[in-house]
From Swiss-Prot:
It comes from the Bacteria. InterPro entries: YaaA. PANTHER family: PEROXIDE STRESS RESISTANCE PROTEIN YAAA, PEROXIDE STRESS RESPONSE PROTEIN YAAA. Belongs to the UPF0246 family. GO terms for cellular component: cytosol. This is UPF0246 protein DSY0297. GO terms for biological process: response to hydroperoxide. Pfam families: H2O2_YaaD (PF03883). It comes from Desulfitobacterium hafniense (strain Y51).
């Protein structure tokens, strides 16, 4: 089984207590993107990243000085969003790290796909960024089926804990032989499941931690997830969508 998650916009390099074990599989493609981003004028980069001047300035400097083969941090410790805070890899036990290195993959607009212990540097480039160059129409076009092929080399089961922005990179390439399951985390209101961004991110992080703690290898075991008030709802789910409803919000 492979579990896919999204990256986070915010990054840090404070994971010095663990070292990278690998280089990203598509490092050369990341270098090509870096060269292009490095060539952009500041204002053009700011528009591409859709951010304020402070963040644009930080990332303009990053791309100008970036050394993708130099000092790096393990990807799982480099991202600093809500999902990663609730996953809390900083306090993982060794066997949890072994589990996620085998089963977890982080999708990235810049690196394509990452193992947890791939060495990365801070960057900002969302998959949906309107990057149009002489070699691609956008990042979905740039990555084509690269991410999907890497993801399905060894496994035919994919658990989707990523946002639509990132899961879109593989969904168009799915074949009949792939068991693809999406997790939905929401509140039940008037018979409909309503997802709230913050709660979804929290639950995705908790789900990864839950799976690592239990060393889950079978999809059926995922249904036992019961953290943050979420419970699996059989009647709302099907073979390709596992729905978890926040119990306290049911009406």
């Amino acid at each position: 089984m492979k579990i896919i998650i999204s990256p986070a916009k915010k990054m840090n390099m404070d994971g010095d207590f663990l070292s990278p074990r690998n280089i990203p599989v598509y490092l050369e493609k990341a270098k090509k993107l870096q060269r292009h981003l490095q060539s952009l004028p500041y204002e053009e980069l700011r528009k591409l990243l859709c951010c304020n001047d402070e963040i644009a300035g930080l990332n303009y400097e990053r791309y100008q000085t970036m050394d993708l083969s130099g000092y790096t941090s393990p990807a799982i410790l480099a991202y600093d969003g809500i999902q990663y805070k609730y996953m809390a890899p900083q306090v993982f036990e060794d066997d949890y790290f072994d589990y996620i290195e085998k089963h977890l993959r982080i999708l990235s607009g810049f690196y394509g796909i990452l193992k947890p212990f791939d060495g990365v540097v801070p960057y900002r480039l969302e998959m949906q960024a309107k990057l149009k160059t002489d070699f691609c129409r956008n990042l979905y076009d740039y990555w084509q089926d690269d991410i999907y092929r890497e993801l399905t080399q060894e496994d035919t089961t994919i658990l989707n804990l990523a946002s639509a922005e990132y899961s879109k990179t593989i969904e168009k390439y799915l074949t009949a032989g792939i068991n693809y399951v999406k997790c939905v985390f929401g509140e039940l209101r008037d018979g409909r499941v309503i997802e709230k961004g913050v709660y979804v991110k929290m639950a995705r992080g908790e789900m990864v931690r839950f799976m690592a703690e239990k060393a889950i290898k079978d999809l059926e075991q995922i249904k036992e997830f019961n953290r943050l008030g979420f419970r699996y709802r059989e009647q709302l789910s099907d073979n390709n969508t596992f729905v978890f409803v926040k119990a306290m919000a049911e009406k």
